[in-house]
Amino acid sequence: MNFLGVINPVALQLGPFQIRWYGIIIASAVILAVYLSVLEGRKQNILDDDIYDLLLYSLPVAIICARIYYVVFEWSYYSHHLSETYRIWDGGIAIYGALIGAVIVILIFCRRRNIPTWTLLDVIAPTVILAQGIGRWGNFMNQEAHGVATTLGFLKSLHLPKFIINQMYIDGTYYQPTFLYESLWDISGFVVLIILRRQKKLLKSGEVVLSYIIWYSFGRFFIEGMRTDSLMLGSLRVSQWLSLILFISAIAAIFYRRYNDPLLKWYTE
């Protein structure tokens, strides 16, 4: 931490190599998510090794897809800087791209391992949103994914800790801590999903992950509107369009599945 109170994004320097807080936080979030998924997976007769293998396959694909998603919607820049398209360490990944990549891997993985897809998605959904909430603190360390400019007075009115206020002071301007808004929303979503999942005869198979989509996309739509660094598509940001589509689709899927399959089993069965 420097004399202005801004946290150094580099946690440890080993010669020419840097270990950044962002990586530490993301890795910790993934480890916690895997641990909790293993515990829940045992209740649903999913082998521990299946969870570990899924992570091994899905993580690199998710990272690649997150980068591709970002580059595609910033093609006006990267079309003139092709050599930078792979420089992921310079920043520029999108969570929705990562989720799309992970879902593709899950669909293939479940088919090959003969695992019920909806069951596996229900198992990991709450831990994914928890990891997302924790991961936003990596953005905090990098002073990125913040919102529009604001005032010191406004930040103080939120009764935020001083270290958060200091970190939101970037190049002479204070910014909205949208990372914090999303982190709190995601962690709250984790709690809600766990409570709902534990209720008997409340959620059908597949409705835990659909509830995750509804919760996350609803919050992301509004929080994304406060961002200044996200990708635009017309009058809305790309993530807002996708959030809107996912929100409506998940609600429709719940009604469609219940209407067309009255024998659909409860998650707790």
Swiss-Prot record:
The entry's family comment says: Belongs to the Lgt family.
Q: Where in the cell is it found?
A: Cell membrane
Q: Which domain of life is it from?
A: Bacteria
Q: Which UniProt keywords apply?
A: Cell membrane, Membrane, Transferase, Transmembrane, Transmembrane helix
Q: Any transmembrane segments, and where? A: 21-41, 54-74, 88-108, 206-226, 236-256
Instruction: For this entry, list what GO says about its biological process.
Output: lipoprotein biosynthetic process
Which EC class is this protein assigned?
Answer: transferase
Entry function? Catalyzes the transfer of the diacylglyceryl group from phosphatidylglycerol to the sulfhydryl group of the N-terminal cysteine of a prolipoprotein, the first step in the formation of mature lipoproteins.
MF terms (GO), sorted A to Z: phosphatidylglycerol-prolipoprotein diacylglyceryl transferase activity
The protein here is known as Phosphatidylglycerol--prolipoprotein diacylglyceryl transferase
Q: Native species of this protein?
A: Ligilactobacillus salivarius (strain UCC118)
* UniProt cross-references to HAMAP family, sorted A to Z: Lgt
Annotated membrane topology: Multi-pass membrane protein
UniProt: a 1,2-diacyl-sn-glycero-3-phospho-(1'-sn-glycerol) binding residues: R136
- Its GO CC terms? plasma membrane
Pathway(s) where this gene product acts: Protein modification; lipoprotein biosynthesis (diacylglyceryl transfer)
Enumerate the PROSITE patterns for this protein. Answer: LGT
This entry's Enzyme Commission designation comes to: 2.5.1.145
